[in-house]
């Protein structure tokens, strides 16, 4: 389902559970691990765009990596890992019966999804015919300010496309936590774990 789980890929030492060694029948969906894979797709997309600007044979690679990124973005958006009440991304445990338990600990894990963002020339990302054919709705949505592709005016008046893993309102709410002295912001930088967890947290169940 393109959501990453199983530990190792993310910031395992910040979780109240051992993400690499879960109880039998329990699996985990990781906000940060999923974001790392989206960031990988974004990096490869940008490289493919550079190559395609010199040789159209690489257009297929542009399509491939944009498709991967959008699949991950859609999966994360539909997953429910973003808590609308708290305005934050949480990992989630799923047991053998399908019961879902969010790990409501605010750490850097929940901020990683907003880092999976890139900026490319809008004309360049729209140029390949295969891209226009397969992602016509996505590119049309960009013009109306919807979806993971958003148009912006870059330096020198150039039109660029910001391709982001999370929706703008999700990024804004997450950043509000970053700048809050009662959560992540400290006199010495950012905390790895929110100050709200001075009171110990226990995973339900």
Name these PLM-found stretches:
Residues 1-205:
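Acidic, mature catalytic/reactive cores of soluble proteins
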């Amino acid at each position: 389902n393109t959501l990453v789980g199983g530990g190792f890929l993310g910031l395992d030492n910040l979780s109240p559970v051992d993400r690499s060694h879960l109880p039998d029948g329990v699996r985990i969906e990781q906000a940060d691990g999923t974001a790392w894979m989206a960031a990988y797709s974004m990096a490869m997309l940008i490289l493919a765009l550079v190559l395609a600007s010199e040789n159209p044979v690489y257009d297929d690679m542009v399509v491939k990596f944009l498709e991967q990124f959008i699949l991950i973005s859609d999966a994360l958006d539909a997953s429910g890992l973003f808590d609308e009440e708290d305005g934050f991304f949480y990992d989630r445990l799923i047991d053998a019966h399908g019961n879902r338990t969010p790990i409501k600990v605010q750490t850097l894990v929940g901020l990683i999804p907003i880092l999976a963002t890139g900026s490319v020339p809008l004309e360049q990302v729209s140029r390949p015919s295969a891209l226009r054919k397969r992602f016509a709705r996505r590119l049309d949505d960009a013009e109306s300010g919807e979806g993971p592709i958003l148009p912006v005016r870059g330096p020198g008046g150039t039109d660029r496309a910001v391709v982001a893993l999370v929706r703008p309102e999700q990024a804004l709410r997450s950043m509000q936590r970053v700048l809050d002295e009662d959560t992540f912001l400290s006199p010495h930088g950012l905390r790895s774990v929110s100050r709200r967890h001075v009171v110990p947290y226990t995973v339900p169940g």
